[in-house]
Amino acid sequence: MKMKLGTNLGFAINKYIEPEVWAKIVREDLDLKSVQFVADLLNPFLPDDYINSQLMRIKEAVKKYDISVDSIFTSAFTRVNHLMNPDAEARKIWLNWFKKLFWIGSELGCKTGGSHFGILTFDSFEKNYDFLVEEGVKGWQELSFHAKELGYESLIFEPMSVPREMGNRVSESIDLMNRVNANCGIPMKICLDIGHAPHPDERDPYPWLEKLGSVSPIVHIQQTVLNKSNHAPFTPEHNETGIIKADKVIAALEKGGCEETIFMFEIGHREHWDTEFKIIADLAESTRYWREWVKE
């Protein structure tokens, strides 16, 4: 199996937002060359002039540090209802938002991108589930043709942890993917997160890797414990109690027929005195742990 190691840039939100800063950290402190850019660092709602100036900065920074921007994704502050918003006008706004997001990604060289599938409110989950899921499917289908024009090879969505947020079972994730792919410009695939704690009957991450790894060009990696998504680093302290073992992850993917994937760290540090000053050290330790298996 062909493997690469990189990081989702969620760790940089509010902390290392300057392109020159996060690019230097990724390349020199973490010894990584691949990133997943996130919308929270350059929101498509921002004015065009500002977006264009920031794109120039980002391009210069990644060129200087020889970094590849392989994909673009939503993140903490863009984890919203979007294509399954109960309001039709809001759904249209978010559809156009995604089109602009994928354009931003294309400017940075991305070949895939995506988000969670969509989120229902408690009220819409009870009253309009089928209609809004179909709206989500149609939205992603339209985006797949748009992304094809931008040079993308696929779109990806991330299975989430509760029914309202879609994909909390393997079968549901496959069904959503297949429904989009019934009429698509480029295929919809999966961005697995090995730390998500979905349906109570399916909380072991390794069967997910076996069953969906072959359609997961990107896998979010984090250390965690059973029944909780910790987004913890792969440090000795967390590895001692955590359920994620790099060799087991790779073995499960290979068993499921995965031929190629990019492991992207999605590690979070809350704003707390005990974690604020060891973010980079924890990320670097996580890279050292995974480098035993992912050599590139």
Which sequence ranges carry the predicted segments?
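Histidine-acidic metal/acid-base catalytic patches
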Residues: 1-6, 13-31, 63, 109, ...
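Short coil-to-beta-strand
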Residues: 30-33, 62-74, 106-117, 217-219
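A short beta-strand-loop structural module common to alpha/beta enzyme folds
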Residues: 33-43
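Short beta-strand segments at enzyme active-site cores
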Residues: 36-37, 70-74, 110-117, 152-158, ...
